[in-house]
C-alpha cells in the first residue's frame, strides 16, 4: 500500500499536518475554493521564488498564510514593498485581514517539491533527463538526505514510446509511518508532450507522535 499512496497523505496526523487548517460550517466549499485560488495565485505570482508549501490558517475573521520559500528576498522585495502588495491583493481575495509569514528553506536540495520543479524546468530546457536526475540525487545525498528516489515518466528524450525511468540512492521506507518522507510532483511541458516528475526524499525518523513535526523542523532550519 505504501508503494501506491501519497506519502504525505498517509502520514497526516502522525508526523505531518494539513496545509489548510481551519474549521467551517456551511461555507466550507467556498473557503476550500478560496484556498485553492490563493495557492494558485501565489504559485504563479512567485514562480521565481522557489515556493514549496503554502499553509493557510483561519482564526476568527482573519487569514494567516505561511509561505515556505527558498528565496525569501524575492517574496519580500525592496523595503518589503512586494510582500505588502501581495498582502493587499490577498485581503481583496479573502475579504478578511491577512497576515503573511515567510519561512526560508535553507536546503532547497532536500525539499521534494523544489527538486521536482527544478528537474521539470531542466527537462523543458532540453537538458538530458538522466543527467538532471543524477545531479539532483547527488546534491540531496551530499546535503544530508538518508535516501532519495526520483521518477520521470513520459516521452523522455523525445522517444516515440513513453516510458518511466527512476533513480534511487539510500533508503526510502514508504511503509514506515514514523519515517519523515517528503514527496513532491511536477510536470514538464516539452515540445513532445508532458513529462511527469515525482520525488521522494527520506530525511530520518521522527520518534515522537507529533503532527506538527514537519512544520517545526522547517522553521528550525530557517533560523
UniProtKB/Swiss-Prot annotation:
It holds the Pfam family KH_2. The keyword rRNA-binding applies. PROSITE patterns: KH_TYPE_2, RIBOSOMAL_S3. SUPFAM superfamilies: Prokaryotic type KH domain (KH-domain type II), Ribosomal protein S3 C-terminal domain. Belongs to the universal ribosomal protein uS3 family. Residues 38-106 form the KH type-2 domain. This is Small ribosomal subunit protein uS3. GO terms for cellular component: cytosolic small ribosomal subunit. Part of the 30S ribosomal subunit. Forms a tight complex with proteins S10 and S14. Binds the lower part of the 30S subunit head. Binds mRNA in the 70S ribosome, positioning it for translation. GO terms for molecular function: mRNA binding; rRNA binding; structural constituent of ribosome. Keywords: Ribonucleoprotein, Ribosomal protein, RNA-binding, rRNA-binding. The lineage of its organism: Bacteria, Pseudomonadati, Pseudomonadota, Alphaproteobacteria, Rhodospirillales. The gene is rpsC. NCBIfam families: rpsC_bact.
